[in-house]
């Protein structure tokens, strides 16, 4: 009987761990190549998640493209329209890369300039483990790039975007030949069955 109860306990725990955590909001990025669902970690990167959700809720990402795609590295978007003109953004946020999250395949992180605290709306999804992007120390060279979530559905779409042929356009390199556009970005409400 003890073995049966222990087995049942493990089974129940396993089922619960496969469901979404209600404290982790999810965002759907509908692109012209398919939909990517991202789970966010406000407990690890509160300012970054708040910033990202503000852009999502404002409809900012609709019509933006993945403007930088590098095979075996990452796909980057969230700042340019199909005309390769940057969209006006809110002020930069503090870099929360020292949160313990790593730039592993399928994670989403904030893009920025060489200044550590310069991220606004642009983000990237890692298509491989990119350890060199992780936080090392609080210097300009060591700050790293803040991971604030991960892809939970649609990694095949990320891979399809990564496989696009690229070119140089409007002074930018690694731009997909055919625009990969975010049609819509929105928060997803989880059903009671999905939340435990």
Task: For the regions a language model picked out, list residue spans one by one.
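Bacterial N-terminal signal peptides that target proteins for export
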Residues: 1-5
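Cyclophilin-like peptidyl-prolyl cis-trans isomerases
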Residues: 9-196
